[in-house]
Regions:
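Bacterial N-terminal signal peptides that target proteins for export
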Residues: 1-10
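Conserved beta-strand hairpin/beta-sheet module of binuclear metal-dependent hydrolase folds
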Residues: 32-77, 181-185, 189-195
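Active-site HxH/HxHxD metal-binding segment of metal-dependent hydrolases
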Residues: 79-159, 178
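Accessory terminal helices/loops
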Residues: 10-25, 225-230, 239-306
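Divalent metal-coordination and catalytic microenvironments
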Residues: 40, 54, 64, 78, ...
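Short, hydrophobic/aromatic-rich segments at coil-to-beta transitions
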Residues: 38-42, 164-169
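Extracytoplasmic/secreted envelope proteins and their assembly/folding machinery
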Residues: 38, 51, 71-75, 102, ...
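Metallo-beta-lactamase
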Residues: 59-61, 67-69, 159, 166-255, ...
């Protein structure tokens, strides 16, 4: 009996210790990881979409600023690679995991986006198929009196800077959203694609913010064809890839569109098309699609197909 009593006390103490340790630990630390892509260009991972940090003669341009609360850790990591001031943010599109950190940067920093993204960021509508976390801000920019919103926009193409510091911005059409910007660091031959090329997977098609399942394949193919002298591509959430990977991804999305349209023409329902879909063998290695996203994408292509 005495042995059982002692054991019970020890177990209780252990549970209290575990609970106390868990309470003391608090939320996980926000750690930004850094990869040097080329001499003055870095990719910074975790906390949302991949950020690019481009060190220029007169300061730093940052592409995408991650989730709420990740702006400060991103700023600290940038300080570890350069002491130059941040002069510009370029947001590839409107989603919160790419733009929310804007509000944690100095108010003097210029924010640049495609003109459609600027409109989308005024409203910050939840993307198609995504349920916001209970503690997520409804509109982080309204909560911060408009701080972090774009001051400069472009329509089809814009160049910023010259020579080694030149950045070219392109818009090739609807895809992930209706404002996906392609950011080219011209002298380095590197492009940041944002989430229109998030990785080798089924994309998130955000019809709420103007995305298109019918057009995304053509948009990707146009980017692969029209942007010259690029050999590396920073993806939205995956590893650095190549133009050949981008061409393959364009074909993957076109194949998906064709599959859905053929199913609709044959009289199949959205549920039937989604249930039957498998990643084609020629795209072996692509991530298996989550069921909800697959059905959302089938629905979007279905609705766009008349």
């Amino acid at each position: 009996m005495r042995r059982q009593l002692v054991l019970g006390v020890l177990l209780a103490m252990g549970m209290v210790s575990i609970g106390t340790a868990a309470w003391q630990a608090g939320p996980a630390p926000r750690v930004v990881e850094v990869d040097q892509i080329k001499d003055n260009l870095y990719m910074m991972r975790n906390g949302g979409g991949n950020s690019a940090v481009f060190i220029m003669a007169d300061g730093v341009t940052v592409v995408d600023t991650k989730n709420p609360g990740w702006g400060a850790p991103l700023l600290e990591k940038i300080k570890s690679v350069t002491g130059k001031p941040i002069v510009r943010i370029i947001n590839t599109h409107t989603h919160g995991d790419h733009v929310s950190g804007n509000v944690e940067f100095p108010a003097t920093v210029e924010v640049v986006t495609h003109e459609n993204t600027a409109k989308n960021m005024q409203e910050m509508k939840s993307p198609t198929g995504i349920t916001p976390a209970p503690d997520a801000p409804v509109n982080i920019f309204k909560d911060n009196n408009g701080k972090g919103l774009p001051r400069r926009t472009f329509k089809d193409k814009m160049s910023i800077g010259k020579g080694a510091d030149q950045i070219d911005l392109y818009y090739f059409g609807r895809g992930h959203t209706n404002g996906d910007a392609w950011v080219v660091f011209r002298a380095l031959g590197v492009m940041h694609a944002g989430d229109i090329f998030s990785g080798k997977n089924i994309p998130l098609l955000d019809a709420v913010n103007g995305g298109s399942g019918v057009l995304i394949g053509d948009t990707l193919a146009k980017a692969a064809k029209d942007v010259k002298n690029v050999d590396r591509i920073i993806t939205g959430h995956s590893t650095v890839m190549t133009v050949a990977d981008l061409e393959e991804y364009a074909a993957f999305n076109t194949d998906f569109k064709n599959t859905v349209q053929a199913g609709k023409k044959a009289g199949q329902t959205v549920d039937q098309i989604a249930a039957a879909y498998k990643i084609p063998e020629r795209f072996k290695g692509y991530a298996a699609p989550p069921e909800a996203r697959l059905k959302n994408n089938v629905q979007i292509v279905w609705d766009e197909t008349k």
